[in-house]
Structures are given as C-alpha cells and as structure tokens.
Amino acid sequence: MAREKFQRKKPHVNIGTIGHVDHGKTTLTAAITMALAARGGAKGRKYDDIDSAPEEKARGITINTAHVEYETENRHYAHVDCPGHADYVKNMITGAAQMDGGILVVSGADGPMPQTKEHLLLAKQVGVPNIVVFLNKEDQVDDAELLELLELEIRETLDKYEFPGDEIPIISGSALLALEALTENPETKPGDNKWVDKIYNLMDQVDSYIPTPERETEKPFLMAVEDVFSITGRGTVATGRVERGCVKIGDTVELVGLRDTKTTTVTGLEMFQKTLDESVAGDNVGILLRGVQKIDIERGMVLAKPGSILPHTKFEAQVYVLNKEEGGRHTPFFPGYRPQFYVRTTDVTGKIESFRADDNTATQMVMPGDRIKMIVELIQPIAIEKGMRFAIREGGRTVGAGVVSTIVI
C-alpha cells in the first residue's frame, strides 16, 4: 500500500510556550496535545515525553527543545517547548525554532516573574509578533479579585514590552487539572470538564488572535550569493539558495552588499542542470545575470527585489555568548573587541562598540554564557535587516549567536 501523503489542507503556524521556570509551560503543552487528541487533532504527549527534550544543534549551539504538532479545526501547529531557561534564550536568538506566535504562561500563584519579563523582551527583540496569555494555576487563587489584579499586572507588563496589553487575550485555567482529567479519561469532550474546556478556549483564542504568517514565497525575493562563475558567451551566474520570495526570467534584481548596489536583469535560471522559468524559496539555483562581470559579484552579496533590502554597517543586536563547555571563549571580552560576524554566507569583521544590559545600562565586560545587547560596526556594508540572524566567530569557531534588533546606520 502506498504511503499516506502529508495533506496540507490547513494553514501552518509555528508557536511556542514561553514564561518563567515552573509556571507550567510543559504541563500546558502536554494538556494541549491531550485535549486536541480527544478531538482527533493530535497524538497525546505525556509530560515526561516533552520534558526529556532531545538536544539539537543550531548555529553550533546545543539546545534542548521538544517539538510537538497538533491541529485545531482551522490550523496545523508546530509547537516548541524548551525545558530550561538557557534553552529558551538560545532558541530565540538562534531562531532554531522560529515562532509566529507565543503562549505566555504565567502562574496565578506568582504573577509575572523575572523570566516572564526576559522572555517578553526577547520575544519583542527577535520578532515574535503575537502573544496570547495563559494564566495558569487558577485553582490556587481563591479570590476572584486577585485574579483580576493579576490580569491587570500582566497587561501592564505586556505594555511595558510594547505588546498591545489591552488587546491580548488572557485565558485563565489549570494545565495540571486539565491534564489529570484527560489522563483519567482521554475521551473527554468539550463540555465534560471545565478545566479541559479552558484549554479548548485557549486554543480558540490562539486560532483567532495569532494571524496566519505570510508564506516565505509571498515575501520579496532574496538570495544570498554562495558562488559565482562565468559561462562563455552567456554571462555571469550567481548560485545560492533562495531564502524567500520567487524570481522569474526577466525580473530586475539588485546586487546588495560589500560594494555599491547594482541593478541587473535575470536572463536565465537553472536548477540541477535544467532550466526553469521561475524559482521559489528553498530552491538551490543558478541565476544568469545580464551585463554583470564575474569580478562584480562575490560571495556574501545578496540578490534581492529592488528596494527590499539595503546595505548597512551599524546595528544593535541581542547576542548569546557561548560558554566554554559549548566551545566558546574561556575569557571575557570588552568594548572594542573585533571578531568576525558570519551573516548568511560570509564573514565580515566588525567592531563591538558597546554593550548594554536589559535595563539599558552600559556594561564594560561580557562573560562567556551571558546574554547581552551590543552595538556593532562592520568594516564593510552588507545587506542587513531587523530580525536577521548571525554568528560571531573568532579563529573559525563560533563564540556567539545574535539577532539584529535595530538598524543604526
């Protein structure tokens, strides 16, 4: 019998649970899978399955993440949950598991705590666009007024980190009581148990409040140049993987980065020795360009839709500095440090001008294992945009991972 084909009937959204340690992120993840499994939209996963998350490597950094998938009536979700706080920080900065939205879990017994705030700040800086809040452990709060006060405090915290605190849905419940009810009776249907219903309610809010992301193919075309060669009598070919968008023969594209921006026309597209009319995100392709010499292009430039991305030299970034167990530095570094910044396909030297802590106070020293905000100035302009990921390298080894939070120049 032929294998069943993956049917893409529903739009796909990547989400994750974020929040302070022990507020119930993993319990909630398990409860969601069990609740949706009762409706036939998931394979139920136990807490221990999710908690013993396997190690993965992203940009040379080891991260523990658990991936679960489930479906609601409207969507297919991939959901990421990280067991440890350090894993969250690394995951958000490296973009190992991209998130289109997040479920912020806050314990009703504690309210917003330091990591709640840190995850919100990170979500804002790395571009997690939308958040829904689950106010957990509602059964431990005896007073309805206290719940209202907690909700106010959460909304104020959201506002502080530039999320729309007034609009964001806050659903209260108990992930543990829902999970216990579902473990006892995996067939629990909507209406059978008030705690399980709260999980369904949460997922309805996630369905309606977190917008379906724009697909990669609908974004403006961009391809980082990996290699260049010339074909006698035909012109110059740039090869690489299309990062987003699509490109057709006859399109005008810009060569951005390292030198002055140059405009050219696509005269041919090739993939696996076959010619194409159009190439889309994910394709490894050779693009034949009109009127461009081989010496005009080098690895590290990008080909992009005109006006969609600009060359920059100075930016602010959120960076995680690897500790020595992760293969990073053994010693601290200071403002003025000049490592290599590996962006897309190339290394560019840059100078780290200054470091700032979360509260914007200047810091003079950064230790391995720290997360820090830094201002970087590159020696050559390259195509940079907010939300872009990069690695920091020194002598060929990765010493940090970062994401651009603001463009300065």
UniProtKB/Swiss-Prot annotation:
Residues 81-84 are annotated as: G3. GO terms for biological process: mitochondrial translational elongation. Mg(2+) binds at T26. It is an enzyme of class 3 (hydrolase). It holds the Pfam family GTP_EFTU_D3. SUPFAM superfamilies: EF-Tu/eEF-1alpha/eIF2-gamma C-terminal domain, P-loop containing nucleoside triphosphate hydrolases, Translation proteins. PANTHER family: ELONGATION FACTOR TU, CHLOROPLASTIC, ELONGATION FACTOR TU-RELATED. Its EC number is 3.6.5.3. GO terms for cellular component: chloroplast; mitochondrion. This is Elongation factor Tu, chloroplastic. It catalyses: GTP + H2O = GDP + phosphate + H(+). Residues 174-176 are annotated as: G5. GTP binds at residues 19-26, 81-85, 136-139. Gene3D superfamilies: P-loop containing nucleotide triphosphate hydrolases (3.40.50.300), Translation factors (2.40.30.10). GTP hydrolase that promotes the GTP-dependent binding of aminoacyl-tRNA to the A-site of ribosomes during protein biosynthesis. Residues 136-139 are annotated as: G4. It is found in: Plastid, Chloroplast. The gene is tufA. Residues 60-64 are annotated as: G2.
